Amino acid sequence: MVEIDNVKTRPVVQIKTTIFDDEAPSYLPAGKKWKLVWHDEFNGKEIDKTKWMCRESFWGQDFPAFAHNFEGVEMTGKTVRLHLLRKGNDFCSPHLQTGSLTYDIPKDTKGFWPFGKMRKPLFMHKYGYYEIRCKQPKYAGWHSAFWLQAPGVGSNPDASVCGVETDIMENYRQHNHGKIIAGNGWGGYGKDSKWFGHFSWDYEADKDGWCYYGVDWSPKGYTFYANGKKIGEQNSPVSNVEQFVLVSTEARGYRKIGNDGGLSAGRRTWGKPDPKLFEAVLPDFFEVDFVRVYDEVPQDVKLTKERIKFPKKFK
């Protein structure tokens, strides 16, 4: 992992922007005009299944760390909570996404083709600003993430035409080192995968525990932000294809050798839960206030203000 001291050398370059009445503001990159194109404020009584699906499989096999059928998803009327669940001596948690790719599809044939039937994506998008407001879990042994993937990532030697994994936020190192991680990976998840360039910064939250994370993805590259501050860039390669959004959690240990490109899954064996999971006091959860996606619009375009009505927050 590459440590980059961006906080000291880069100014605060985001502007606090009120988007909706009675909702938390966004922090948008300065110097550009933005238009909201997709969002979930998580105000309903149930998760919006027109926007989110669950990842339940890993490399064609049922993965014990992924909860099924939105189990562990709690709607508070203001936020969504993704809970860590204990089942005997095993643990799992929800993994939400707006699309799908080959390795999270159960294999449904005994023939040579290693993939099952593709799932229709619920939301795919190219370029723009992707933002989350969230509270991190209290206990170690599992992690949260906000990221982007493409259905064809790694399927072509040229990442620009098949997609890049963009990790906008991962809290792998929060509890042990006080760090949050971001950066890109490409080339798939096997021997061609490339992961250099990830960077970390000090974990910070407001007095109530809320954090903002985002990425400005453009044809020129990726600029990462946390809590109104620009914290890093990664400018090559750049995906020029539509990708889907993930808000995920995962109990550690089941991948055996960490992020090994799925090779342990290829052997159809899983590891055992991280011992730290047994120290967690439940309930523990990753809480999300909103996910928003914005498009950059040309400076000479005049935006019309549309008042969007939402159901009142539940008390």
Spans of model-derived segments:
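GH16 jelly-roll
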Residues: 2-315
